[in-house]
Regions:
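Surface-exposed binding/hinge segments that line
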Residues: 119, 124
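Feature responds to low-complexity, polar/acidic, surface-exposed segments characteristic
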Residues: 1-12, 16-43, 52-115, 129-188
Length: 189
């Protein structure tokens, strides 16, 4: 199970979960950005990430939701979700993959495989939960923002703050963390 691959659609949903945007994704289910996601249970997540320019299609108006996600695609999605795309001048997959390694997204992940596994995804998402997000800051009515790394409001802290008591209720799991919770909920979405 941990060694199985994960699809592009499933990974999109997990990125939305990590960003704590499930409610927003639910409002995006009827958006028609891609012709091949209408029947996908993850269509809201895919559409939201497309609108936010975190994912792109595969050409001809398609997303290919059932294809396994490649390691470099996962790196690009996570780097963009963290906001670091603003410092990437070369938008090749290699550049995003390099940046993902630099900021810690790929720590403890085998980068030699073309496709990521469930285990790789869990490690990458868990890494992202603790990486400071790149956020825009506006100074003196300047229209163009400056960007800073916000070490205080990581996805983990934002996720934990979103629950009433700051805890995450787990069902059927003895020991787990936020990334395990995010993954365990993918089938129920």
């Amino acid at each position: 199970h941990l060694d199985s691959n994960i699809t592009r659609a499933e990974f999109a949903q997990l990125v939305v979960n990590m960003m704590n945007h499930k409610a927003v994704a639910a409002t995006m289910e009827s958006a028609g950005y891609f012709s091949d996601v209408a029947d996908s249970p993850y269509k809201g997540a895919i559409n939201l990430l497309y609108k936010e320019e975190i994912v792109s299609g595969t050409g001809n108006g398609t997303f290919d939701p059932n294809r396994n996600v490649r390691y470099q695609e996962a790196c690009k999605m996570l780097v963009k979700a963290l906001g670091y795309h603003v410092i990437v001048s070369d938008t090749s997959l290699d550049s995003y993959t390099f940046l993902a390694g630099t900021i810690g997204v790929t720590d403890n992940v085998d980068s030699s495989k073309e496709y990521i596994t469930v285990k790789d995804m869990l490690v990458m998402v868990d890494n992202c939960l603790d990486i400071g997000r790149m956020v825009p800051m506006y100074y003196n009515d300047n229209i163009a923002p400056s960007y800073i790394i916000d070490e205080e409001d990581t996805f983990r802290s934002l996720f934990e703050k979103s629950t009433p008591d700051g805890t995450i209720k787990m069902e059927g799991i003895v020991t787990a963390d936020a990334s395990t919770y995010l993954y365990s909920k993918r089938e129920s979405l």
